[in-house]
Amino acid sequence: MAKKQNFIHGAAILTVGVIIMKLLGFIYKIPLGNILGDEGYSMFTSAYSIYFIFFTLATAGLPVALSRLIAEADANGRAKQEEKTFRVALATFAVIGVIFALILFLFPEWLAAKYLENPDAALSIKAMAPSILLVCLVSAYRGYCQGNGNMIPTTVDEVLEVLFKVISGLILASCLLKAGFGKPVGSAGAILGVSIGSVI
């Protein structure tokens, strides 16, 4: 009965968190579009589509699998196995994150021209490199927390990540454009907000 209540409580917390994140993401698009203009916003959305692909490849199913392994070890009282599983998962996530971050950082021009047909988005793609590494590492910790049945740290972390992404992205984009930098740099500044949000 207690486990069922904990599950319902955790699901409710996660649902509220998802709603808040969706609202923040929706609100974010309006001022960002006004700041960057059509040209800059096109670079941002193009680069973000590449980020989403790499994010999906880097984390697809892995946090869920980790949470199940952690939950099983925790239920059976195998603390050492739980710790070992987390260490292996963290190392795996780190390797995946480094590989994908290097691809984004070293080949942004090729990705922008080949897949986006928008060469001006190259700088924004490069700016995403730190974010994909940080997201991979954070995903391991989220899977660990979920496996232990504690949804509060995961939900709070995700909401704060989106909040700081919104704030830092808007500030960076606005400041860079006001300083006289072009739209590609302004778009890259908005993208850096994703990395800042991941650090938080």
Annotated model-derived regions:
Residues 32-53, 120, 183-192:
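Interfacial/gating helices of multi-pass transporter permease domains
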Residues 99-119, 177-178:
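Short membrane-interface helical motifs at transmembrane helix boundaries
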Residues 135-157:
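Membrane-interface junctions at transmembrane-helix termini in multi-pass inner-membrane proteins
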Residues 37, 59-91, 147-152:
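Transmembrane-helix boundary and interhelical linker motifs in polytopic inner-membrane proteins
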Residues 1-24, 80, 84, 151:
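N-terminal membrane topogenesis motif
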Residues 45-70, 130-133:
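Small-residue-rich midsections of specific transmembrane alpha-helices
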Residues 117-141:
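Alpha-helical transmembrane segments of multi-pass membrane proteins
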Residues 157-171, 180-200:
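Hydrophobic alpha-helical transmembrane segments
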